[in-house]
Amino acid sequence: MGTVDAYLRQPWSTVHAIPMVSAFAQNWERVDNFQSRPDDIVVATFPKSGTTWISEIVDMILQGGDPKKCKRDAIVNRVPMLEFAAPGQMPAGTEQLENMPSPRIIKTHIPADILPKSFWDKSCKMIYVGRNAKDVAVSYYHFDLMNKLHPHPGTWDQYLEAFMAGKVAYGSWFDHVRGYWERRQEHPILYLFYEDMKEDLRREVAKVAQFLGRELTEVALDAIAHHTSFEAMRDNPSTNYSVVPSQLMDHGISPFMRKGITGDWKNHFTVAQSAHFDQYYAQKMAGTDLRFRTHI
């Protein structure tokens, strides 16, 4: 399976009963057996929930708020994605991470219950970002249109049903957001919300810095909030994924950084779809105190 054609637009594979990107699922042992280090910082999200955004924020905090240092390399190299693989095109995430000096920032979308055991055993700090399900579904649909590592999403209606049923990469959004939420009692997890970041980015950056034990000046906090605005990141070649080969991601179909707003779901969901989704959501989120905002 070394050629690109062997894994582009292929159906999902399955890893530990979770749907997974075909290219990533090959040789999953490298992920299961991955050895963490106690000072690793894990950035975890369900896809399309602000992963690149929080990754850039964490890197900037570690660099003391210096934007020049964050332009030293593309985000995919500064914050490797643990499970990523695109044989013959780009290095695997596990390979990149093994060669990185500490402290490493490790990005992942892997659900909590199948995250490599080593991260839990070593009590690595984790930063999780949750985003409301309706906006995630819309963003993920557009992402799957342009990301050839995923199968074609079909129509929006078909995709929404698949999303609700957990038949998308990384499985159920509901299980994912709850999985990390429930583990935060016993594990050092800072649980953030995309909507809070949109509302007051500087406040949320300060939370992350405090969680990581990093003292930042007011000037550094301002610099990070400015540098990590959606507009700045969309126009920054080191964060906008323009380095990813067009064979894998076609930015002409939909840019990797598309809108970065809360409430775009209203432009896609019909009234009937929204009502159907809300009913299903209430069932799946029963019994948890985890709450999301669908508008700000």
From Swiss-Prot:
GO CC entries: cytoplasm
Name the enzyme group at the top EC level. transferase
Active site feature: H109 (proton acceptor)
Gene3D superfamilies in the record: P-loop containing nucleotide triphosphate hydrolases (3.40.50.300)
- Which keywords accompany this UniProt record? Cytoplasm, Transferase
* Catalytic function, reaction form: a phenol + 3'-phosphoadenylyl sulfate = an aryl sulfate + adenosine 3',5'-bisphosphate + H(+); 3,3',5-triiodo-L-thyronine + 3'-phosphoadenylyl sulfate = 3,3',5-triiodo-L-thyronine sulfate + adenosine 3',5'-bisphosphate + H(+); 3,3',5'-triiodo-L-thyronine + 3'-phosphoadenylyl sulfate = 3,3',5'-triiodo-L-thyronine sulfate + adenosine 3',5'-bisphosphate + H(+); 3,3'-diiodo-L-thyronine + 3'-phosphoadenylyl sulfate = 3,3'-diiodo-L-thyronine sulfate + adenosine 3',5'-bisphosphate + H(+)
Q: Where does substrate bind?
A: K107, T108, H109
Instruction: Write out the similarity annotation.
Output: Belongs to the sulfotransferase 1 family.
Which protein are we looking at? Sulfotransferase 1B1
**From which source organism is this entry?**
Gallus gallus (Chicken)
